[in-house]
């Protein structure tokens, strides 16, 4: 009996499909088991994951330390891990409950509701301590473990500056094509120092507890739980920052207590322009993009803080006579509109008289149209302040992520327009500088004119504390102000606080003597209540006689009479003094 042609075709088609399926199966199980599809999926790892329950204790990523070696991120705290299979065993529930300070019923209920291992931390068990962990582990019962885990719910200090991490498989493979061993779930730095130092922070191996389960979640191989950990004494690496944990924490507490919603504060060590504390508001929330901007690295209208530049240029060009006075009943355009009376140069600076500095700026610009930006550069306001240099294969490595540089003029034509010059002289028009640059300007003046790069990372260390890389102190390039100019600036900055009518007179009773300059910049915005909103600054240094700290506080988008700038500056100086006293 002959087989019909149609039957033959059907058999051939079946064999072709069968062969293709067989080929696909071989591709999956034999040829591309560790790098399947365009996504390079490791099928062996994924199949193991399907039948494995795990508790991640540490992802193995490098961490950040403060200047004294205290943890800023990756802080571990006691935790007790209980596996669900305990409910099927005659386990020492009474002993565990006693150690944790819980009732047996609560503990049984907590475990009974869980489909995955239960993690009990200090958030739930307030009395959990190192002693608790020791007692738990002394039970030596499978499925009950005392460990030290990273608390992801605990907010890290300096969150905007330290930055954040996220999973991005495409970016991971693009940035690190030679690191194929990294799982696609590996988190990489997306903002802040986490991003700039990402290459040094990538994990070698995570630390976890794991056990194999069947389809119903029951243990496959008895109650055997495996502990996997990084045995390398050198990795993960640690970034030792210049931040002082005590100062950083105090600054964040002050801004929270005062209720400053937008803006921030930055404190520098004047000796080498290293960051001791830096806070940006609102608090960083990775789910809300508009909270992630670090305002301390963002150019903002400086208002009258910029008069420091005009004062420096006037002093350097010998335009101010000791007996010279200014009519401060005039506004910035030289028209009637103010009521400060006749003031000397020093008192004009102390009381922030607009007319004095707009008239000086006009005279300066007639002599040299580049004088304002040149002096801004001498005072470290127009180049990004952060540390830059060579780091292995990177010739222009920058420590600070997404740091912007200041801008003075928006249009060259403005240099010949009287009103534009006047607005520029008082830190408006197109003038925008970062709070970090302003803090560095104050540090530069306090040091006698020496410009330095602002450093936030001191060194990269191995896990055992030995040094891999040290970031040396570096000077900023370009011209600087001379000793005489810096001394005269120090004098008038001190006058701002000493003068009975000075804009910084509130700081007269602080435990440190303060020198500085206030600033109020118009934003062109209104609040919901139709109130005019301003950027309110105070920038200065202390102690004035032996400068050690440079501090800038900025309250953004605030009604003038509700600004918290001075209150925050006052409280931070007090906190720094308390910390210094306690450290002695």
Swiss-Prot record:
Disruption phenotype: No visible phenotype. Spores have normal morphology, heat-resistance, cortex structure, and germination and outgrowth properties. It comes from the Bacteria. SUPFAM superfamilies: beta-lactamase/transpeptidase-like, Penicillin binding protein dimerisation domain. It is an enzyme of class 3 (hydrolase). Its main location: membrane. It is found in: Cell membrane. InterPro entries: Bact_Transpept/Beta-Lactamase, Beta-lactam/transpept-like, PBP_dimer, PBP_dimer_sf, PCN-bd_Tpept. The keyword Plastid does not apply. Residues 1-11 are cytoplasmic. Coiled coil: none annotated. One of its GO terms (biological process) is peptidoglycan biosynthetic process. It is a single-pass type II membrane protein. Pathway: Cell wall biogenesis; peptidoglycan biosynthesis. Keywords: Carboxypeptidase, Cell cycle, Cell division, Cell membrane, Hydrolase, Membrane, Protease, Signal-anchor, Sporulation, Transmembrane, Transmembrane helix. GO terms for molecular function: penicillin binding; peptidoglycan L,D-transpeptidase activity; serine-type D-Ala-D-Ala carboxypeptidase activity. It holds the Pfam family Transpeptidase. GO terms for cellular component: plasma membrane. Gene3D superfamilies: DD-peptidase/beta-lactamase superfamily, Penicillin-binding protein 2a (Domain 2). Residues 33-584 are extracellular. PANTHER family: PENICILLIN-BINDING PROTEIN 4B, PEPTIDOGLYCAN D,D-TRANSPEPTIDASE. Penicillin-binding protein with an unknown catalytic activity. Penicillin-binding proteins (PBPs) function in the late steps of murein biosynthesis. Beta-lactams inactivate the PBPs by acylating an essential serine residue in the active site of these proteins, thereby interrupting normal cell wall synthesis. Belongs to the transpeptidase family. This is Penicillin-binding protein 4B.
């Amino acid at each position: 009996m002959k087989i019909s042609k149609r039957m033959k075709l059907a058999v051939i088609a079946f064999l072709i499909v069968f062969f293709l399926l067989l080929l696909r199966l071989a591709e999956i199980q034999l040829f591309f088991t560790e790098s399947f599809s365009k996504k390079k999926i490791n099928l062996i790892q994924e199949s193991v994951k399907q039948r494995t329950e795990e508790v991640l204790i540490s992802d193995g990523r490098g961490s950040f330390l403060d200047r004294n070696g205290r943890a800023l991120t990756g802080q571990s705290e006691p935790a007790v891990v209980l596996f669900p299979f305990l409910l099927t065993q005659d386990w020492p529930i009474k002993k565990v409950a006693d150690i944790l300070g819980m009732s047996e019923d609560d503990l049984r209920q907590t475990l009974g509701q869980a489909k995955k291992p239960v993690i009990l931390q200090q958030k739930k068990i307030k009395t959990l301590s190192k002693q608790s962990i020791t007692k738990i582990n002394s039970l030596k019962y499978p499925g009950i473990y005392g460990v030290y885990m990273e608390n992801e719910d605990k907010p890290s200090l300096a969150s905007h500056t330290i930055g954040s991490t996220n999973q991005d498989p495409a970016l991971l493979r693009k940035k690190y094509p030679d690191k194929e061993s990294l799982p696609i779930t590996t988190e990489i730095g997306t903002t802040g120092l986490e991003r700039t130092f990402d290459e040094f922070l990538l994990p070698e191996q995570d630390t976890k507890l794991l056990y194999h389960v069947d389809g119903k979640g029951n243990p496959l191989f008895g109650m055997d739980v495996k502990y996997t950990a990084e045995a390398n004494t050198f990795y993960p690496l640690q970034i030792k920052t210049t931040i002082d944990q005590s100062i950083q924490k105090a600054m964040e507490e002050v801004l929270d207590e005062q209720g400053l919603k937008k803006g921030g504060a930055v404190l520098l060590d004047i000796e080498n322009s290293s960051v001791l504390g830096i806070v940006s508001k609102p608090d960083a929330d990775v789910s809300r993009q508009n909270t992630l901007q670090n305002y301390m690295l963002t150019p903002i209208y400086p208002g009258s803080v910029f008069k420091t530049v005009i004062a420096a240029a006037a002093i350097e060009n010998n335009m101010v006579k000791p007996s010279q006075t200014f009519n401060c009943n005039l506004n910035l355009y030289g028209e009637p509109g103010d009521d400060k009376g006749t003031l000397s140069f020093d008192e004009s600076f102390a009381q922030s008289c607009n007319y004095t500095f707009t008239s000086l700026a006009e005279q300066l610009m007639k002599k040299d149209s580049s004088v304002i930006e040149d002096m801004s550069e001498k005072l470290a306001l127009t180049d990004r302040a952060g540390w830059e240099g060579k780091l292995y294969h990177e010739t222009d490595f920058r420590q600070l992520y997404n740091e912007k540089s200041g801008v003075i003029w928006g249009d060259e034509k403005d240099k010949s327009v009287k009103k534009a010059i006047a607005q520029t002289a008082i830190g408006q028009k197109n003038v925008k500088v970062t709070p970090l640059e302003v803090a560095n300007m104050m540090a530069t003046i306090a040091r006698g004119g020496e410009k330095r790069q602002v450093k936030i990372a001191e060194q990269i260390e191995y896990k055992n504390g030995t040094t891999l890389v040290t970031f040396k102190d570096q000077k900023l390039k370009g011209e600087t102000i001379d000793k005489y100019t810096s001394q005269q600036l120090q004098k008038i900055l001190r006058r701002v606080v000493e003068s009975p009518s000075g804009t910084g007179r509130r700081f007269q009773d602080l435990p440190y003597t303060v020198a500085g300059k206030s600033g109020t910049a118009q934003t062109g915005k209104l609040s919901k209540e139709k109130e005019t909103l301003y950027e309110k600054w105070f920038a200065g240094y202390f102690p004035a006689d032996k400068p050690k700290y440079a501090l800038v506080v900025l309250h953004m988008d605030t009604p003038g009479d509700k600004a918290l700038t001075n209150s925050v500056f006052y409280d931070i100086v007090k906190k720094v003094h308390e910390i210094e006293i306690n450290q002695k």
